Amino acid sequence: MPSKQPGWFANVNPNVFFGTVIIIALFLAVVVIAPSSFELLTQQLKQWITDSFSWFYVLSVAFFLILLIYIACSSIGRIKLGPDHSQPEYNNGSWFAMLFTAGMGIGLMFFGVAEPVMHYVNPPSGDAQTIEAAQQALRVTFFHWGLHAWAIYAVVGLALAYFAYRHNLPLKTRSALYPLIGKKIYGPWGDSIDIFATIGTVFGVATSLGFGVTQINSGLHYLFGVEQSTHIQVLLIIFVSILASLSVFLGLDKGVKRLSELNLVLALILLVFVFIAGPSIYLLQTTIQNTGQYISNLFTMTFNLYAYQPNGWIGGWTILYWAWWISWSPFVGMFIARVSRGRTIREFIVGVLLIPTGFTIIWMGFLGNAALFSIIHEHQNTLIQAVQQDSSVALFEFLGHLPWSGVMNILATVLVVLFFVTSADSGALVTDYLTAKTENSPTWQRLFWTVLMAVLAIILLLVGGLAALQSSIIMSALPFTVVMLFMSWGLIKALHLDVTKMQAIQEARITPRAIHNPRSWQQRLGLIMHYPHSEEEVREYIEKQVDRAFENIKHEFRRRHLEVSITQLEDGMQLRVDHHNEINFIYKVVSRETVPPSFLIGRTEAEDGQYFQAEVFLREGGQNYDVMDWTQEDLIQDIIDQYERHLYFLNIVRS
């Protein structure tokens, strides 16, 4: 393929972009030409994978959850997803809203009522339609949508965010394998990994669009008598895609973020309504009891393969869920990484695991228990019949038994549409990240993927290929599980090095810079109290003093046969010492705006003025000290101090 693309294609990675499009086109050709044969083949392969590799899925997902708990509880959790000085890009409310809506918001609308009722009617073990079956139904539902699902997303998201923001690698799936294959991520290996992730994202969103419009169509039929047909569903896909395109056009902050926040608010309104209109005390009691049973049985359920009572249930439920979450993890993990810069690893893991799981438990607990209450205590068996005939109408049938059912069903329909829009626009943004050369790609690229997903969903809906596509996605989860295990291995290696460096810096015996400083104490105090108020003053210092110090020490390093480079940055200057196959040493002096301490200068001046400082940055980020007005000798001594710490760290790594 050509290495340079003129015009519109100037910002695409041609190998990933065109490779993805060609494979999708070939897949469509096969499905359109022989849909029945292809569906039969994929169903047989899916069944073989389920029968032969259930144990592998169960062990892998258990490992991901245990790994995250270990990382969060260890000293590794203090490491930031970005330089040490970085701060979260989004507040907690916006962050959670985007996690929730991109991860599984639409699934909660579809299965919030349907899955507990399904397990109540057909439990994995024991007698159906009993109190024990009701308790087991909620416990299993929590299990499928709780910690394990978010652990899968969190492993991919953590690996991508760590290598992208901590080590300045591209925010692409390939970067998570850097510790294992090194610079090969920039070649065919890396392109292949990104193509795989891109195809999974496109197929996953297209499948959700195709199946999801059936629920929207069901809601419109239930509310307004709109015909349930393929033509109506095609129009709905076009409508959802237009809304998604508008959100994509507005971008992450103005489009996806605001839409996610609106989704969360509307979902909370629906949840509160169900709680108030339903049996409130019963919902509180049962949800709390279900949560306790979920937690107390978590370890047993994690490793339960039903090996002594094989009935096919685990393959149709737990293994299907694990495979589905894994197949979606490149998309959701990438999106989580994109919105999580600046958070500590502990904050990331706790947030991604516990907050969505907690909301899921409340959602499933309230809606599921309210539905079971109407079946068990109010004998509303029509809900069972509705779920068995068409699970997509379960939510609307359930709301029909509550007050204000018309208004709430309209709200539910709007929520379903908005959740699909957020899934589609998030998928388009992620796909664009994977196929573009830089993050700042032209709008047409993001819109292209939105349109492609819609076209793919429409074609598969018309030829009846959605089931085959769903089976193909689930099949793709098996090789990607292996990729995730390698990701985890590489992540552990890199995190271990990061912690080792933190310990090396603390343990290194370095002579304090003040001992080298020949100034009097009066001169040193004057420097401490000096607060420049113009960025030009700091930049002038960097261009003169820092540049000369860097040139002098570069000369000495090169005399000792080390490769050294000096780079002029937009806001400062960087010195880099190459160590080839080992971690390079980086020392930067950067002009940064900060708040002047009001106890040293007049409060009015502190509040009104701007204070810039010349801050030292290492590979790990800002070091929180100012070198403004240091002499060249002071700077060189500090560089040597930091370089000595770096060598101490490398010695520990070697040993």
Question: Model-derived features: where do they sit?
Answer:
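N-terminal alpha-helical transmembrane segments of multi-pass membrane transport
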Residues: 1-133
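Membrane-water interface regions at transmembrane-helix termini and the short interhelical loops
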Residues: 2-9, 34-49, 68-87, 137-144, ...
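Flexible loop linkers connecting adjacent transmembrane helices
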Residues: 2-8, 40-46, 73-92, 117-140, ...
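Transmembrane-helix boundary/entry motifs in multi-pass membrane transporters
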Residues: 7-15, 50-55, 84-102, 137-147, ...
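Helix-loop-helix module between adjacent transmembrane segments
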Residues: 8-18, 22-32, 65-69, 104-108, ...
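Loop-to-transmembrane helix boundary motifs in multi-pass membrane proteins
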Residues: 10-24, 182-191, 226-245, 249, ...
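Membrane-interface loop-to-helix entry segments
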Residues: 18-19, 50-56, 60-63, 193, ...
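Extracellular/periplasmic helix-exit of transmembrane alpha-helices
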Residues: 111-123, 275-297, 357, 361-389
